[in-house]
Amino acid sequence: MKAIVFAYHDIGCVGLNALAEAGYDIQAVFTHTDNPGENRFFSSVARVAADLALPVFAPEDVNHPLWVERIRELQPDIIFSFYYRNMLSDEILSLAPQGGFNLHGSLLPQYRGRAPINWVLVNGETETGVTLHQMVKKADAGPIAGQYKVAISDVDTALTLHAKMRDAAQELLRNLLPRMKEGPLPLTPQKEADASYFGRRTAADGEIHWQKSAFTINNLVRAVTEPYPGAFSYLGQRKLTIWRSRPLDLVHNKLPGTVLSTAPLTVACGEGALEIITGQGEAGLYVQGDRLAQEMGIVTDVRLGNKPSNTLKRRTRVLILGVNGFIGNHLTERLLQDDRYEVYGLDIGSDAISRFLGNPAFHFVEGDISIHSEWIEYHIKKCDVILPLVAIATPIEYTRNPLRVFELDFEENLKIVRDCVKYNKRIVFPSTSEVYGMCDDKEFDEDTSRLIVGPINKQRWIYSVSKQLLDRVIWAYGVKEGLKFTLFRPFNWMGPRLDNLDAARIGSSRAITQLILNLVEGSPIKLVDGGAQKRCFTDIHDGIEALFRIIENRDGCCDGRIINIGNPTNEASIRELAEMLLTSFENHELRDHFPPFAGFKDIESSAYYGKGYQDVEYRTPSIKNARRILHWQPEIAMQQTVTETLDFFLRAAVIEKTAAPKDELNA
C-alpha cells in the first residue's frame, strides 16, 4: 500500500518507523525545518527518513497547488499525519482512496487542539492516551480507528509523559497498521458533546498565580518544566523559575505568594503551600530550593508575585463608532470591566449606553459619522484600536434602501479605513457572515470558502458585496501598506438590546426582534418561506468575549486574520426559533400583559422583503480560527439566549404600555 507521510517530532519518527516495519510503500515524507528558537528535545524525522532512504521535503505551504499536484502524481493509497503541525487541505486528503489518518496525543474527543500533553498535566488529569483517527475538515474531529490509554502519575512531567506517549503510539501503530493494509478498519464517530479544545501555549502561560491551590500550581510546574521554559514568578523585578515542586496540605493564614520558610523553600498558596524543590534565578544555576533562597536573598514573609511595572501603563484607547448599537454597547460593557481600557464612542443616540455615561473611562459624543468626519479623524489619530460598527444590517433595508446601504456601509466606512492607514492605527472591522452568500460548503471557512452571491437584480446582496469589498480593501492595505487589521464575522448574534420594538414595527429589525413584536402585539408570526432557513445563533456574551480577545490581541495573534464568531451547535431554523420563543412566552411571568397568540403565518419572501430578495438555506461557521487563535469556545445554549432576550423585550414592552397613558395626559 502506497503511503504519503506528514510527520514531525518523536512521534513522527515512531510513526515513520512503524510504517516501514509494517511494509508500507512510503512514497514521500513531509516534515518541518528545525526552528532555531525552539528547544529541540526530540528526534529528527528528516534523519529517520534519510536513514530509510526516503524522499523528504519541508515545504513552507504543503497545501500550495504545486505541492498538491506533486502529491497527486505519487498516487497514494493512504495518507498519515504524525504530529505534523499544519492542517492538510481537503484537496490533499481526497487524493488518497483510503483517506488520511492522524495520530493525536490525547484520548479524543477530549483535548483536541494543540499541546495536549501539557494541557492534561495543567488540568491534573490522571489518564490520557493516543488516538489514530480519520482526518476531516475540522481539526481532530474525525472518526476513531483506535486508541491506547496512558496512566498519568503524580510525579509525571511533560517529558516523562511524552516518553510514555511515544511508547503508546508505537504499540497502537503496531496493532493497527498491519490490519489497515488488509482493508478499511471499522471507525467510531466521536461524540461532539464530550469534545474539548485547547490552543497553543506560550512561555508567558508559565507565570504562577499564587492565589490558586498548591495542587494546581504544582500541576503547572509539572506541565512546563524542562525541556519547556518552566513555571516562573518574581521577587520584585527578578525572575525565578521553578523546575520541581511538591504540593503541601498545609494550613496557614498568610497571603498567597508569601514565603513561609526558606529551608525548605515553601510558599503560601490560595489553598495549601508549595515546596520549591529545585529552581533557578534569571542569571543563576539550577539549584535546590534552599540554595535558591540564599542566592536570591529570599527571606521569610517576603512575597513572590507578578513583576511590578516600572512605569504606569496608559490604558488602551478604543474608538467605537456605533457605540450605542447592539455590539457596541455590549462591547463597551466588557471593556470597562477591565481597567486596561478606556472607550471613546460616537453614535446618534445614547439609550443603550446611558448606564456608562458616568464612568470616567467612557467618553461619548452624540453624532453622525456622515457629518462628524473631523471628530472621527481626530479620534482615530488619538486612539489605539478602531472599531467602525456603524452599518445598516437588517435584510429588509437591503432591498428597500440599497443605495443608502452602499453609502453608509461602504463609502463612509472606507473613509475610516483610509484614516487608519494614514495614522497607522489598528482596525478591528466587522465583516459579516453575509459575505459567504450562497456558499455551498458545509461549514463556511474564512480562508478557503468561496463567496457566492446572486445576480445583479437581487439587490439584497448589496450589503454582502459592500462588506466583502471592504474586506478586500482592508486586506490589500495590510499587504501593501502595513495596515494592522483583524476582520471578524459574526454569525447571528442575539441577546438583550438587539434592535428595539419600534424598529421591528417598521420591519427594520433582525428576526428574533420581529418575532417577539408579533407575540407582544398579538399579530400572527410571519414565517418567510415557511421559516425553513437555518441559522447558527450565537449568544451576545459569547460573541463579545471573542471580540474582546481580538481587541486584546495577545502577542499579535490576531493581526492579519479573519475570524468567524458563531456557535455551530446552536443551529436552528427560523420556525424552530419561533416555536422556542412561543414556549418561553407562554411560560413567562408577564404573559398576562399581552394578547393571545395569533398563530403562525407562512409568507413568500418576495411579499415580505420585495422582489430583490434572495435567501440562503443555511449559514454554518467553521470556528477553527477562533478556537486556535483566541482559545475561544462558545458555551451558551440557544434556549438560554432566547429566554433572556425575550425577558428583556417583554419587560421593556410592559414599561412602555404603563407609561403610555401618562404620556398622553402630559400631551
From Swiss-Prot:
Bifunctional enzyme that catalyzes the oxidative decarboxylation of UDP-glucuronic acid (UDP-GlcUA) to UDP-4-keto-arabinose (UDP-Ara4O) and the addition of a formyl group to UDP-4-amino-4-deoxy-L-arabinose (UDP-L-Ara4N) to form UDP-L-4-formamido-arabinose (UDP-L-Ara4FN). The modified arabinose is attached to lipid A and is required for resistance to polymyxin and cationic antimicrobial peptides. GO terms for molecular function: carboxy-lyase activity; UDP-4-amino-4-deoxy-L-arabinose formyltransferase activity; UDP-glucuronate dehydrogenase activity. NAD(+) binds at residues 347, 368-369. Signal peptide: none annotated. It comes from Yersinia pestis. UDP-alpha-D-glucuronate binds at residues 393, 398, 432-433, 460, 492, 526-535, 613. The record marks 102 as: Transition state stabilizer. Keywords: Antibiotic resistance, Lipid A biosynthesis, Lipid biosynthesis, Lipid metabolism, Lipopolysaccharide biosynthesis, Multifunctional enzyme, NAD, Oxidoreductase, Transferase. (6R)-10-formyltetrahydrofolate binds at residues 114, 136-140. Residues 314-667 are annotated as: Dehydrogenase ArnADH. The lineage of its organism: Bacteria, Pseudomonadati, Pseudomonadota, Gammaproteobacteria, Enterobacterales. This is Bifunctional polymyxin resistance protein ArnA.
